[in-house]
Amino acid sequence: RSCKKLLPVKQGERGLRQSDAVFHHTKQLPELMKQLFDKRYDLSAVGYSYAPRCAEGSYMPCFLVGENVAQAVSLACGADLEKTSHQVGHILAALYSCGKLDMLSSDKPFAAFHVSGGTTDLLLCEPDKAKLINITQIGGSRDLKGGQAIDRTGVRLGLSFPCGKELERLASESEHKIKPKASVDGLYCSLSGIENQCMKLIDESCSVADVAAYCIDCVCL
């Protein structure tokens, strides 16, 4: 069962300050927990994300809110507590959704591409019995992240943050596709040019649908 609620972001803003993110996590989690536990469950384990990535220095204070709730639920239910990173959670969700969880028990490494507002990483994933997955970044964006390019373009077009869903809808209405440009060096890329190109198209009065399509095509390229 899934219960979720987006954190509120003011119109025209491109995200939340960390202090505001902690506040809204703290405020909204009790309501979500009430929805989730409207009936009893026989839990064997509680999992939570302790950090954005499994990398030294990867830290965001809002993860402490989730960790505290997970620890409380674990103690109350007598369930095991399992921690991992937000990035590993995305990879596990992808494996689960495509019916490939068996890859975790294989001795063969695999590649994953994690694109979000904070990451655009090409990852070498090696199954590990203790850690589930050992992750090594082998490529990705050297500057702007894919989600940042999408959200910054969307906010400039007047969309509400996060902008991905609405930008994709606008892109589907485009009738004049603009050939995407990409700056690639081996397994790494640079996405900062996408933002500049999209802003230039907006200033030139290009249709919002065409700008949206161009932005998404560049990120997906």
Segment roles from a protein language model:
Residues 1, 105-108, 114-116, 121-209:
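A short helix-loop
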Residues 32-33, 40-42, 51-81:
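Phosphate- and other anionic-substrate recognition elements at nucleic-acid/protein interfaces
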Residues 31-36, 214-221:
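Phosphate/ATP-binding catalytic cores across multiple sugar-kinase/actin-like superfamilies
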Residues 79, 83-110:
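Conserved phosphate-binding catalytic cores of ATP/NTP-utilizing and phosphoryl-transfer enzymes
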Residues 49-54, 85-91, 119:
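Acidic, glycine-rich active-site loops and adjacent beta-strand->loop/helix elements
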Residues 1-44, 48, 52-54:
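N-terminal beta-alpha supersecondary unit
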Residues 45-47, 62, 110-114:
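Short glycine-aspartate micro-motif
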